[in-house]
């Protein structure tokens, strides 16, 4: 068998094969013999069908089987012999198979790039300075008050405001004709919740119990009901009741509602400040990591296989779908399809692939590997985060080789990031100065 390898570019190879005629003939005879065992042709017993009829009825299938066998056997053998590291499946181009003649075909495949990483020490990056913002704690306390609020009847003559709960009847019409699904009685709506068509809730502000009014709105383009999409509508509304939120007082008793450890309001505030600081530090470090990897890529521009980009953007898509599902949302509700998502985030996926390949190269060059002690520590973190028993988590990764390999790869990448960061020139600046 003759094999030659062409470099289409740094990440794509073309393997050319010529398989000897005697090998082709042997495979053809073998395929015919196998088909003959099971061939069912009227007038002949199985295994006794003449070869000429086998060729006539099964020639196309035979050719497919032979080509498949020849390609599989020769391609994987050649990839191993040539020391190639393919990404995905090859694109095959072949001549027509003819018994007694050599069979020629080519296999074009993307391969992992050979990355010679450089200039990864002394990278200059900026880091956002951690600044405590007391307003964040105040806003969080306000949210907690809102969650514990009780609804009470509004004072007589009270004008509806954002945040109030209004009970009303409504009937919607277009060009004077009432439409299906456009009316309800005793409907309760929190003004400002965004549950209604844009502009509806704002026009209810200022109404009082007993108000009868007409609200004019436009259904947005792309509205779920195509018959209403983009059309102006009138809603006759009759306000029947208004309830206002009665917020609990911010004091020690309020704090105790959130746990025995919060005996005073100051203790609750301190905990909220601690949580906020931890979250901010995590965000700042994640953004620093992104800037560091971006700086590394700028020093080491590399080509990446499209198959790896495809794989990465698919993983991003699935992760996004899971996150949205946890919030009872969907991609469709965000106005996107799988294809539009992939198109929008493809370049981001490409940069992630570049970063991973470069970090892997740094780890390889610096002989960076996670230790068993580090693995055990990470398993403890996972157990705590998922609220599972440590032994159960450890057993899962012990029996699931793929999961363990993925975890070790992520830990290796994290250690490579730390290695580069420890040797980088990091400048802390206020958030306002970061571009």
Curated annotation (Swiss-Prot):
The gene is tig. This is Trigger factor. Its main location: cytoplasm. Consists of 3 domains; the N-terminus binds the ribosome, the middle domain has PPIase activity, while the C-terminus has intrinsic chaperone activity on its own. Residues 163-248 form the PPIase FKBP-type domain. Transmembrane segments: none annotated. The keyword Cell cycle applies. Pfam families: FKBP_C, Trigger_C, Trigger_N. Belongs to the FKBP-type PPIase family. Tig subfamily. One of its GO terms (cellular component) is cytoplasm. It catalyses: [protein]-peptidylproline (omega=180) = [protein]-peptidylproline (omega=0). Its EC number is 5.2.1.8.
């Amino acid at each position: 068998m003759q094999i030659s390898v062409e470099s289409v570019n740094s990440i794509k190879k073309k393997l050319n094969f010529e398989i000897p005629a005697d090998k082709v003939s042997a495979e053809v005879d073998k395929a015919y013999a196998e088909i003959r065992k099971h061939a069912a042709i009227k007038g002949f017993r199985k295994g006794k069908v003449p070869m000429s009829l086998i060729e006539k009825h099964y020639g196309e299938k035979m050719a497919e089987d032979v080509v498949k066998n020849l390609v599989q056997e020769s391609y994987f053998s050649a990839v191993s012999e040539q020391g190639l590291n393919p990404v995905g499946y090859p694109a095959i181009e072949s001549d027509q198979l003819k018994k007694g003649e050599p069979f020629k075909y080519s296999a074009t495949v993307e391969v992992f790039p050979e990355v010679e990483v450089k200039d990864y020490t002394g990278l200059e990056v900026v880091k956002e300075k951690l600044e405590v913002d007391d307003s964040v704690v105040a806003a969080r306390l306000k949210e907690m008050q809102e969650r514990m609020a009780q609804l009470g009847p509004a004072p007589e003559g009270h004008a509806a405001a954002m945040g109030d709960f209004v009970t009303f009847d409504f009937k919607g019409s277009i060009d004077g004709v009432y439409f299906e699904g456009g009316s309800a009685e005793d409907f309760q709506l929190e003004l400002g919740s965004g549950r209604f068509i844009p502009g509806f809730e704002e026009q209810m502000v200022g109404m009082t119990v007993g108000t009868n009014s007409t609200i004019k709105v436009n259904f947005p383009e792309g509205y779920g009901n195509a018959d209403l999409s983009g059309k102006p509508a009138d809603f006759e509304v009759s306000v029947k009741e208004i309830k206002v939120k009665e917020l609990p007082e911010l004091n020690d008793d309020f704090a105790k509602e959130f746990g025995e450890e919060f005996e005073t309001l100051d203790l609750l505030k301190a905990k909220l400040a601690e949580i906020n600081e931890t979250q901010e530090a995590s965000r700042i470090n994640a953004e620093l990591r992104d800037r560091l990897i971006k700086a590394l890529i700028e020093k080491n521009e590399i080509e990446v296989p499209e198959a790896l980009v495809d794989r990465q953007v698919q993983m991003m898509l699935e992760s996004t779908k899971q996150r949205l599902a946890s919030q009872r949302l969907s991609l469709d509700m965000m106005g996107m399809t799988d294809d539009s998502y992939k198109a929008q985030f493809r370049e981001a996926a490409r940069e992630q692939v570049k970063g991973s390949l470069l970090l892997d190269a740094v780890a390889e060059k610096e002989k960076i590997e996670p230790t068993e002690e580090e693995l055990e520590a990470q398993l403890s973190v996972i157990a705590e985060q998922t609220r599972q028993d440590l032994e159960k988590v450890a057993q899962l990764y012990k029996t699931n080789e793929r999961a363990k390999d993925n975890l070790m790869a992520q830990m290796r990448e994290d250690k490579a990031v730390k290695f580069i960061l420890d040797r980088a020139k990091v400048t802390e600046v206020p958030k306002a100065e970061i571009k």
